[in-house]
């Protein structure tokens, strides 16, 4: 039961950090490539 309570307290923290960093990454991509439907660094 103690491990389950530890899991319940760790999972929200990790998900908050993950989604926060993902949102920051998307914001920075949109800052350098605004309104890009196809990203220039993916085209060959």
UniProtKB/Swiss-Prot annotation:
Keywords: Chloroplast, Membrane, Photosynthesis, Photosystem I, Plastid, Thylakoid, Transmembrane, Transmembrane helix. It is found in: Plastid, Chloroplast thylakoid membrane. InterPro entries: PSI_PsaJ, PSI_PsaJ_sf. GO terms for biological process: photosynthesis. It is a single-pass membrane protein. Gene3D superfamilies: Single helix bin (1.20.5.510). GO terms for cellular component: chloroplast thylakoid membrane; photosystem I. Its main location: plastid. The chain crosses the membrane at residues 7-27. It comes from the Eukaryota. The keyword Transmembrane applies. SUPFAM superfamilies: Subunit IX of photosystem I reaction centre, PsaJ. Pfam families: PSI_PsaJ. Belongs to the PsaJ family. May help in the organization of the PsaE and PsaF subunits. This is Photosystem I reaction center subunit IX.
